[in-house]
Regions:
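Residue-level detector of secondary-structure transition/capping positions
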Residues: 14-15, 207
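N-terminal secretory signal peptides and thylakoid transit peptides that target proteins
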Residues: 1-13
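Viral virion structural and adsorption modules
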Residues: 7-8, 18, 38
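Compositionally biased, intrinsically disordered low-complexity segments
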Residues: 10, 20-21, 65, 87
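C-terminal region of N-terminal signal peptides and the immediate post-cleavage residues
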Residues: 16-30
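GH16 jelly-roll
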Residues: 28-272
């Protein structure tokens, strides 16, 4: 995740709510005309479908001056059925664990890329709201020379930062708009619609409901330069889905007082 410096700049720059887009109707059933979807119906204890997901097997360095990048505060992602697996009840489980000498979490990134004019949604339960955990549901672009990231839901176990929904327009975390959100341990759906007028977010979407947060395509001003950035309407620009439960780092904080194992459950991911 690229957006770690944003918190150091504060949460003062909130995007104003703009006109509500016409909501795109989801297919009537899970077998409908989704562009991409996974209901996680695999065998109990198995890895997620490798044709749809790549499981991370390494830790991701995070640059942040808060001090939590020290090794004792930095859990690794592990490609292990202890940390990333399907539970046999139609859920993907990302589990954070505490081993004698380290902490481990899980991250999966989608193999499918989607373009503008799409709606992305996941149903998630956070049994991981404890010190040290750092769960997130987000979209990214890893093309060379590109930038941009969409964080639908991110919670921080460091005890200092509010959970948030954020749009990043560059890779250094200096051009962003963010909205603090309330997060709990119940099941919730987190949806984003991305179109030419902007990016719109809903929690537990119902027909006719306005988005709780919107960022217009006019661009996001960089904190360090008098320029407005917006890669999301570029020709050929795509995003791919990521789900993760990290441990430690600047967002998770010190996990020593946390309760482990801790889990992030994902019922489904759907794009249409």
């Amino acid at each position: 995740m690229d957006r770690r410096r944003m918190i150091m700049a504060g949460f003062g720059a909130l995007a104003a709510v703009i006109s509500t887009p016409e909501a795109t109707a989801a297919p009537a059933t899970a077998g409908g005309s989704y562009l991409f979807h996974d209901e996680f119906d695999g065998r109990v204890g198995s890895a997620p479908d490798p044709s749809k997901w790549v499981v991370s097997g390494h830790r991701t360095p995070i640059k942040n001056p808060t001090g939590f990048d020290r090794p004792e505060f930095f859990g690794e992602y592990r490609d292990s059925r202890q940390n990333v697996f399907v539970d046999g009840k139609s859920n993907l489980v990302l589990r954070a664990t505490r081993d004698p000498n380290s902490y481990f979490g899980g991250l999966v990134s989608g193999t499918w890329r989607g373009a503008i004019g799409t709606t992305w949604e996941a149903r998630i339960k956070l049994n991981c709201l404890t010190a040290g955990c750092w769960p997130a549901w987000w979209l990214s672009n890893d093309d060379p020379g590109r930038s941009g990231e969409v964080d639908l839901m991110e919670w921080y176990g460091n005890g200092d930062w509010p959970a948030g929904t954020t749009v990043h327009a560059n890779p250094d975390g200096t051009a962003f708009k963010t909205q603090p959100i309330a997060v709990d341990a119940a099941w919730h759906t987190w949806r984003v619609t991305w179109n030419r007028s902007g990016i719109y977010f809903w929690e537990d979407f119902v027909d006719g409901a306005p988005p709780y947060f919107s960022v217009p395509a006019a661009g996001i001003e960089d904190l360090n330069d008098p320029v407005r950035m917006w890669p999301f309407n570029d020709v050929g620009y795509t995003l791919f889905p990521i789900l993760n439960l990290a441990v430690g780092g600047s967002g998770g904080g010190d996990p020593a007082s946390g309760s482990y194992p801790a889990e992030m459950l994902v019922d489904w991911v759907r794009v249409f």
